[in-house]
Amino acid sequence: MGELSGIPLVLAHPRFLVVQKPAGLLSQPGLGAHQQDSLITRLQRECKGLRLVHRLDRDTSGLVVVARDQDSLRDLSALFAARRVQKLYLADVVGTVGKHQGCQDQPLARLERHPPRYGPHPDGKPCRTLWRQHARMPGLTRLWLRPLTG
């Protein structure tokens, strides 16, 4: 479909865009001067009014929805908040997962601040994720992950 500021454009709708965020790029600028390069700053070089509807972590690649205006941002954000948008991730896990599918249901909390790391913690927020094996390789299992909460 093309590119916008070097970012692959997957879908162009009158109210929003869907772009392919590469791994290693922030979704939005960070606090330090060295963290100003981001998906949204690159996109806004060509389209000033664009706004992120959601974010992906720096190390995560994938599709990101970007609203074209404030009204679209409000409407799309409401869909995400109501969990009307399904998220699906493909992840490589070190080791062999014994079962073919399952549900991970553990509360998560921030374990470290810099860099921010999250993990299971009894005082964390509820987090429930469905998973299913996609492929096995030596020492690695590829999983489909579908977060339901968290």
Q: Language-model features: where?
A:
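RNA pseudouridine synthases
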Residues: 1-150
